[in-house]
Protein backbone atom coordinates (compact mmCIF):
# COMPACT_ATOMS: atom_id res chain seq x y z
CA UNK A 1 0.00 0.00 0.00
CA UNK A 2 2.83 2.39 0.85
CA UNK A 3 4.54 1.66 -2.49
CA UNK A 4 1.32 2.48 -4.35
CA UNK A 5 0.99 5.79 -2.54
CA UNK A 6 4.61 6.68 -3.32
CA UNK A 7 4.08 5.91 -7.02
CA UNK A 8 0.89 7.92 -7.06
CA UNK A 9 2.60 10.89 -5.41
CA UNK A 10 5.55 10.66 -7.80
CA UNK A 11 3.19 10.61 -10.78
CA UNK A 12 1.31 13.61 -9.39
CA UNK A 13 4.58 15.47 -8.87
CA UNK A 14 5.74 14.64 -12.40
CA UNK A 15 2.44 15.86 -13.86
CA UNK A 16 2.59 19.05 -11.81
CA UNK A 17 6.11 19.73 -13.07
CA UNK A 18 5.12 18.99 -16.64
CA UNK A 19 2.11 21.29 -16.58
CA UNK A 20 4.08 23.90 -14.68
CA UNK A 21 6.70 24.02 -17.43
CA UNK A 22 4.06 24.25 -20.14
CA UNK A 23 2.65 27.26 -18.34
CA UNK A 24 6.05 28.98 -18.39
CA UNK A 25 5.56 30.33 -21.91
CA UNK A 26 4.14 33.83 -22.20
CA UNK A 27 1.18 32.46 -24.13
CA UNK A 28 1.60 35.02 -26.89
CA UNK A 29 2.33 33.69 -30.33
CA UNK A 30 3.33 36.18 -32.98
CA UNK A 31 0.94 36.44 -35.85
CA UNK A 32 -0.14 38.76 -38.60
CA UNK A 33 -3.51 40.42 -38.97
CA UNK A 34 -5.80 39.77 -41.93
CA UNK A 35 -7.52 43.01 -42.96
CA UNK A 36 -9.64 44.18 -45.87
CA UNK A 37 -8.50 46.40 -48.70
CA UNK A 38 -10.63 49.21 -47.26
CA UNK A 39 -8.89 48.84 -43.89
CA UNK A 40 -5.49 48.87 -45.61
CA UNK A 41 -6.43 52.02 -47.55
CA UNK A 42 -7.58 53.70 -44.32
CA UNK A 43 -4.21 52.87 -42.72
CA UNK A 44 -2.37 54.23 -45.76
CA UNK A 45 -4.36 57.45 -45.52
CA UNK A 46 -3.94 57.90 -41.76
CA UNK A 47 -0.52 56.45 -40.94
CA UNK A 48 3.00 57.33 -41.98
CA UNK A 49 6.15 55.26 -42.05
CA UNK A 50 4.51 52.11 -43.32
CA UNK A 51 5.77 49.77 -46.05
CA UNK A 52 3.59 48.15 -48.70
CA UNK A 53 4.92 44.85 -50.02
CA UNK A 54 3.73 43.44 -53.32
CA UNK A 55 4.37 39.69 -53.02
CA UNK A 56 3.74 38.95 -56.72
CA UNK A 57 6.19 38.44 -59.58
CA UNK A 58 8.00 41.20 -61.47
CA UNK A 59 5.75 40.85 -64.53
CA UNK A 60 2.60 41.09 -62.39
CA UNK A 61 4.01 44.15 -60.62
CA UNK A 62 4.81 45.77 -63.97
CA UNK A 63 1.21 45.28 -65.12
CA UNK A 64 0.01 47.45 -62.24
CA UNK A 65 0.65 47.87 -58.53
CA UNK A 66 -0.39 49.97 -55.57
CA UNK A 67 1.35 53.33 -55.40
CA UNK A 68 4.45 53.12 -53.20
CA UNK A 69 4.54 49.32 -53.06
CA UNK A 70 7.91 47.62 -53.15
CA UNK A 71 8.22 44.33 -54.95
CA UNK A 72 9.41 41.43 -52.83
CA UNK A 73 8.02 38.23 -54.34
CA UNK A 74 6.70 35.82 -51.72
CA UNK A 75 9.44 33.29 -52.51
CA UNK A 76 12.15 35.94 -51.81
CA UNK A 77 10.84 37.23 -48.48
CA UNK A 78 13.19 35.23 -46.26
CA UNK A 79 16.24 36.18 -48.33
CA UNK A 80 15.48 39.91 -48.67
CA UNK A 81 13.48 40.97 -45.63
CA UNK A 82 16.34 41.63 -43.21
CA UNK A 83 18.09 43.94 -45.68
CA UNK A 84 15.07 45.74 -47.09
CA UNK A 85 12.94 45.86 -43.94
CA UNK A 86 15.34 46.70 -41.09
CA UNK A 87 12.68 47.89 -38.61
CA UNK A 88 10.87 44.81 -37.34
CA UNK A 89 8.22 46.92 -35.57
CA UNK A 90 7.31 49.00 -38.64
CA UNK A 91 3.81 48.66 -40.07
CA UNK A 92 4.03 46.31 -43.07
CA UNK A 93 1.06 45.92 -45.41
CA UNK A 94 1.25 42.89 -47.71
CA UNK A 95 -0.75 42.02 -50.82
CA UNK A 96 -0.50 39.80 -53.91
CA UNK A 97 -2.94 38.93 -56.69
CA UNK A 98 -5.56 36.87 -54.87
CA UNK A 99 -4.38 36.58 -51.25
CA UNK A 100 -2.58 33.23 -51.28
CA UNK A 101 0.97 34.55 -51.65
CA UNK A 102 0.37 37.51 -49.33
CA UNK A 103 -0.66 35.04 -46.62
CA UNK A 104 2.55 33.04 -47.14
CA UNK A 105 4.64 36.24 -47.15
CA UNK A 106 2.94 37.55 -43.99
CA UNK A 107 3.51 34.24 -42.19
CA UNK A 108 7.18 34.28 -43.21
CA UNK A 109 7.63 37.87 -41.99
CA UNK A 110 6.20 36.91 -38.61
CA UNK A 111 8.58 33.92 -38.44
CA UNK A 112 11.43 36.35 -39.09
CA UNK A 113 10.38 38.45 -36.10
CA UNK A 114 8.29 41.23 -37.66
CA UNK A 115 5.63 42.39 -35.22
CA UNK A 116 3.26 44.67 -37.15
CA UNK A 117 2.30 42.74 -40.30
CA UNK A 118 -1.08 43.11 -41.97
CA UNK A 119 -2.20 41.03 -44.96
CA UNK A 120 -4.86 42.70 -47.08
CA UNK A 121 -5.21 39.97 -49.68
CA UNK A 122 -5.26 40.43 -53.41
CA UNK A 123 -5.05 43.32 -55.81
CA UNK A 124 -8.00 41.82 -57.69
CA UNK A 125 -10.18 43.11 -54.83
CA UNK A 126 -8.42 46.50 -54.56
CA UNK A 127 -10.92 49.25 -55.41
CA UNK A 128 -8.46 52.13 -55.39
CA UNK A 129 -5.76 53.57 -57.61
CA UNK A 130 -3.23 51.33 -59.31
CA UNK A 131 -0.12 52.64 -61.06
CA UNK A 132 1.74 51.14 -64.00
Question: What are these regions, as identified by a protein language model?
Answer:
Residues 2-8, 19-38, 43, 50, ...:
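Rhodanese-like catalytic fold shared by cysteine-dependent sulfurtransferases
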Residues 13-18:
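Hydrophobic helical h-region of N-terminal Sec-dependent signal peptides
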Amino acid sequence: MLKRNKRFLLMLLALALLFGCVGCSDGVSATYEKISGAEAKALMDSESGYIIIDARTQSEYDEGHILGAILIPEYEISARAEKELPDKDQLILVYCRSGRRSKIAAEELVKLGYTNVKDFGGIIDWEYEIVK
